[in-house]
């Protein structure tokens, strides 16, 4: 009887330790932090993090998930102008709310983009909005009022093409600001908002202003 | 039916308790009435809710004090002395006491129910309008129509009376009745602007209607009150504003100007929207 109770108690203790370890490891797991140099951030958006042009993550647990690379944790200085460059390699998904096709909160209220037109020819220009149905992703920091739609690579563009989007925005005081994508780009999930959209390191990120 | 009679030995306790109860209840009610119970008086509906909650709390206070006081008093004065285990004296029902107790309780509960139902039926009336497909919003009426659109993880707002302009913050003119139409583009959210006295479910395919009349200038917070994903906790906005009509006119004019860039590709104002695809890659 005592022996059986001892085994049961030991089993319960082991299970509790395993549960705590699992939850603890899950909570501690975070993507690395990208620190701007000192106010420039360069990111890449891809349809599958395992097959990116610049910062591929072939050993990622979800290599076929959509994501921002090399990381989604960004550290920037407070009350500064941040210059962003996003190399956008994914195709268009389209916005659930077309309203987000407009650029908000950037310096000058616009963004600069090199892209490919319907004939596959390279184009370049400043834009204040894009066709919402042609959006691949957005880079949005709601608490800073920054919403930038990223045009999907045209299907007629040469293979491996990238749209390069540049813009600037100003940070406020110190704090942690979440940033997200408003395009439901998580393939094969309900409303496209599962998986990578709900996981730090893919389409969900933090802007650490310090 | 037995007559209500207080034993001679119990009279000091009853008198003491009654005096104590009256004093503590008066103090308690006065204290409760000093508490700023939310949502406050930023809107007519919010003020009504605050008034109703204050009334209910004030009425509940003497009851609460009476119960707690009896427990504490009994624990002190009727505490068993010594270690001997002896049953207490048998307690038989006292019909007059029970009649008074049930009658008073019934009157209080029915009164509070009447107050609550009346409040719900008048100022804070809500109306859910499930529909089959997108259509045009009901036009007309003196209330300004504002649509609240929830999406993971932000609220946007469309002003039906201003050519359906969509904005990232909620601005409302003071002293003007507003009809809020709350809906969602994806999953279930909840639009909670507690200073306005509004908490409304935001369901896809549903037009959830709430009425609000701001009566004080100032700011208010908006947040989601339905667990909706990784950034649920961030689905908030502290830049809601109640402004004067002239300030509102200037603000909405600027919004319309900004909105022109995207207006052509945004769907017409509708009670709700069913954007596709529901599943990417399906």
PLM regions: where:
Chain A
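Extracytoplasmic entry segments of secretory-pathway proteins
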Residues: 1-129
């Amino acid at each position: 009887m005592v022996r059986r109770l001892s085994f049961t108690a030991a089993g319960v203790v082991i299970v509790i330790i395993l549960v705590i370890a699992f939850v603890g490891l899950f909570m501690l797991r975070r993507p690395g932090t990208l620190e701007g140099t000192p106010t420039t951030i360069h990111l890449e958006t891809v349809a599958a993090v395992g097959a990116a042009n610049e910062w591929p993550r072939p050993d990622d647990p979800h290599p076929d998930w959509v994501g921002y690379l090399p990381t989604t944790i960004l550290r920037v200085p407070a009350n500064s102008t941040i210059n962003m460059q996003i190399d956008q390699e994914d195709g268009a998904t389209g916005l659930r709310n077309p309203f987000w096709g407009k650029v908000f909160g950037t310096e000058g209220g616009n963004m600069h983009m090199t892209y490919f037109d319907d004939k596959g020819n390279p184009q370049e220009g400043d834009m204040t909005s894009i066709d919402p149905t042609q959006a691949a992703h957005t880079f949005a920091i709601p608490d800073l009022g920054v919403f930038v739609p990223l045009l999907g690579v045209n299907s007629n563009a040469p293979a491996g093409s990238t749209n390069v989007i540049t813009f600037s925005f100003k940070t406020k005081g110190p704090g942690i600001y979440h940033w997200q994508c408003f395009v439901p780009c998580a393939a094969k999930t309900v409303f496209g908002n599962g998986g990578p959209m709900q996981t730090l390191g893919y389409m969900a990120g933090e802007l650490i202003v310090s | 039916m037995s007559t209500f009679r207080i034993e001679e030995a119990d009279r000091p306790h009853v008198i003491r308790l009654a005096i104590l109860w009256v004093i503590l209840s008066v103090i308690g009610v006065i204290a409760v009435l000093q508490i700023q119970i939310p949502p406050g008086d930023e809107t007519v509906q919010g003020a009504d809710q605050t008034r109703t909650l204050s009334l209910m709390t004030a009425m509940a206070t003497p009851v609460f004090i009476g119960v707690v006081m009896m427990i504490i008093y009994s624990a002190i004065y009727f505490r068993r002395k010594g270690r001997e285990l002896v049953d207490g004296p048998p307690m038989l029902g006292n019909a007059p006491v029970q009649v008074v107790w049930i009658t008073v309780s019934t009157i209080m509960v029915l009164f509070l129910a009447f107050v609550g139902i009346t409040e719900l039926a008048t100022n804070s009336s809500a109306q859910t309008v499930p529909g089959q497909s997108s259509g045009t919003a009901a036009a007309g009426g003196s209330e300004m129509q504002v649509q609240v659109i929830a999406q993971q993880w932000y609220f946007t707002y469309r002003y039906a009376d201003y050519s359906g302009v969509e904005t990232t913050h909620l601005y409302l003119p003071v002293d003007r009745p507003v009809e809020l139409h709350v809906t969602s583009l994806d999953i279930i959210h909840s639009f909670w602007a507690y200073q306005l006295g509004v908490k409304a479910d935001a369901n896809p395919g549903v037009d959830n209607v709430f009425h609000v009349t701001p009566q004080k200038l100032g700011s208010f917070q908006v947040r989601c009150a339905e667990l909706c994903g990784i950034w649920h906790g961030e689905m908030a906005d502290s830049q809601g504003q109640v402004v004067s009509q002239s300030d509102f006119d200037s603000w909405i004019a600027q919004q319309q100007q900004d909105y022109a860039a995207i207006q052509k590709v945004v769907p017409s104002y509708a009670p709700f929207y069913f954007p596709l695809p529901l599943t990417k890659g399906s």
